Structure formats: C-alpha cells, structure tokens
Amino acid sequence: MFPGSGRKTYRQQAPPPGPPNGYQYGPPPGAQGQYPPPQGYPPQGYPPQGYPPQGYAPQGYPPQGYAPQGYAPQGYQQQGGQQQGGQQQGGQQQGGQRQTYATQEAQNFGQGVGNPHPTGPPPSNPQGFGQNSGMTFQYSNCNGKKKALLVGINYTGSKNQLRGCINDVKNMSNFLNQHFGYSYDDMVILTDDQNQRARIPTKENIIRAMQWLVKDARPNDSLVFHYSGHGGVTKDLVGDEESGMDDVIYPLDFEVNGHIIDDIMHDIMVKPLPQGCRLTALYDSCHSGTALDLPYVYSTKGVVKEPNLLKDAGTGAFNALLSYETGNISGAISSLSGIVKKISNSASTNRDQVIRMKASPADVISISGCKDDQTSADAREGGQSTGAMSWSFITTMNQMPNQSYLSLLNNMRTLLKSKYSQKPQLSCSHPQDMNLKFIM
C-alpha cells in the first residue's frame, strides 16, 4: 500500500511503484529526464499570506514520540535487529537493495585532516570573492532568528520503501534544539507518517515550506533545510552542471507531480537570501553532491575542487591517442596541447559563468551524503534505522561540538569509510574559510 493510503486527498491516482529500484535514486523507469523545470513556479498563490497557514505551524511541537530521549526516540527502535520491507540483515546486500549495516564508530574518529581547533567566529566585515569579481558576501554569526525545515520520506508501502528517513528528521530536530537553540515552534516538519495534510511531504508542500523558510530572512539569521529520502539525477537543461545532469529530490507524490531539481531549490532557498543570512542544507540522499547548486565544492584538504578538464576533450583526445598508437609522437603532442588550451579556457569561462549564476552574498553551506555519482546508504545505528549521513553528522557534532568546517567534513568521512563507500561533500555559495568554527 502506497504512503498516504486512506488519505485519498493526497493520492490523486493509483499507487505509484515508488522511487527506482536498487536505492540508486535515479528517475523512475521510463521517466529519465522527462520532468522539465516547473513553468512559472512557484504556483499561483505562493507564498500564502501569513504563512505558515493555519494548522501548519508546529504549535506545541514536538508531538509525543519526538522527545529527545537519546539517539533512538522511544518507540522507534526495530526489534530483533531486523528490518522489513525488502531490507536486509547483517550488512549483506540482497536483490539490489541498498546496504544496511550495524557499525561501530570508527576508532580513529577525530584524527581527520584539518585544524582540530577552529580559528574562532566568522569575520564581521564583508568578504570578497577574489579575482577582481567585484562581488562580496557576508558570513552570518547565526545570532538572529533560527528556523528549520526538516523533510523525511520513507515511502512506506512502496517497493522501494526506506527505513531511516523519518528517524533522521526526529533526530535532527532534537539535535538542533539541544545544541543550537532552535525552537520546536520554529520548525516545520514534513514526514509521510503524519495525518495533517499540510505536513505530508508532497511537492507542493515541500516548495511551500521552502518559501516559508526563507521568508523575511535577515542578516545573521540561521536557517536549516534537512532532506532525507530518495534522490536522483535528470538531464541539465540550463547548462550549469559540469556533469550535464541536475540533482533532484523525490517528493512523496513524484509520480503524479514530478521531482524537484537543484535549480529550483537554489532559486527558492538561496537567491532570496540577504547578505549575511545563513542557510545550512543537509541532504541525506543519493546523487546529492551538488543538490543545492552551489559553486564552491571543497575537498578534505580544504581547497576548492577543480573541474574535470578531460570531460570536454572529445575528438581531440581520440586524435591524440590515435597519433600516439601509430607512432606519430609529434602529432600526439600537438593534439594534446590543443586539448589542454581549449579545455582550460572553456573550464575557466564556464566556471566564471557558474559563479556569477550561483554565487550569493548570503552565507550558504550544503553538506550532502555523497558525490553526485554515488548512492547514499540506510544504516542501523544505536538500535534504530537511520540515514548514514544524518547519523555521521549528528554523531560527529555530538562528540566534537567545537570543530572547524574542515574537521567536520573529515570526521564525517572517517565515521563512514569503514563500512560505506559514500563520501560526504561540502559546498558553499562563496569562498569558505574551512578553518572557521562550524556554526548553524
């Protein structure tokens, strides 16, 4: 039975089969690249006046069962160490389903690359983008208004049901409240186990809540967007992706109303932000490396990653290889020299264009569960199902609350690498000092 059964208002048609098989989070079968960016979004009437609408704001939140009783909220532990709904036991992968592990924390946690003692709070004056761009941004001190939008979708009853996404949201809400002072009354939570229509994670509700999140944002405010669910890729129609593909997330009703692409999320949650406003986005989904479409992606050494310069080599690379194999060394060298010059100029031009399109004067940070070409795992930690990325972020921050951005990225990877192939990514809307203390 597809999620929302009994709530016919949300379904609108026969139950869809759920996101693609194998936890690869790609588009549903036969739907590759068929969802164009919504025309004229947001839909008429967005954002509603006085949003959140009546009954939507989490009055008196959290409801019973969300209380911060340790990592595993009471009543949400699986029994007997088993998972149902096609999930596997003991970390074995079966039938193409995603991997599930019961892991111990990595013994070398905290030994990652980076400054273990962050340099302190962010500077209070505007910062330049460099390279004579004339652009500036401002770090947020995160002392203003705090708001959070948390989305967790288990797709309950579908053939690609997930187990840890709703738990991720519960754990994240408690973490934000306990460690960074976010009020439950300033959190909007969308999960597919709720009865209120406005809290079901449909495409409409997710977009509406994104707009609520950034509405009336001011300098030094701190906003959080956390998504745990299926993710995928679709063909890039704008030309701002190095890979030629856009990252997407799958709402509960994606079969009816389509997915949400990274360009839309960027336009809704990044572009409206004023200088000095902080948005922290956390994506626990597959193919989520650049899910918020931010131009600066950082390595575990704290430097901006360079684009793949060989991806545009095309026939030039083939000609160079052919010349080499036939003994024409000078021809090979000539071809390769032309390739390097062409690609370097193209990469520089494309990168400058992307920065102009996607950079922001605000302070936007995105931490994602994996690279754009990787999948992200469901885990079993602390006696409950959880997303591996959400677990590693919360565990790392609980154990080392005073650490830098670089240390956080490396420690998350350290926790995951013993059992998972995924590599968390950190991207920014501006050049980031990775040795500053992580705040949100």
Swiss-Prot record:
GO terms for molecular function: calcium-dependent cysteine-type endopeptidase activity. Belongs to the peptidase C14B family. Its EC number is 3.4.22.-. Residues 14-51 have a biased composition (Pro residues). GO terms for biological process: apoptotic process; protein quality control for misfolded or incompletely synthesized proteins. It comes from Debaryomyces hansenii (strain ATCC 36239 / CBS 767 / BCRC 21394 / JCM 1990 / NBRC 0083 / IGC 2968). GO terms for cellular component: cytosol; nucleus. Residues 98-110 have a biased composition (Polar residues). Involved in cell death (apoptosis). The active site is at 230, 286. Residues 82-94 have a biased composition (Gly residues). Residues 52-81 have a biased composition (Low complexity). It comes from the Eukaryota. Residues 1-134 are annotated as: Disordered. This is Metacaspase-1. InterPro entries: Caspase-like_dom_sf (IPR029030), Metacaspase (IPR050452), Pept_C14_caspase (IPR011600). The gene is MCA1. It holds the Pfam family Peptidase_C14. Coiled coil: none annotated. Disulfide bonds: none annotated. Keywords: Apoptosis, Hydrolase, Protease, Thiol protease, Zymogen.
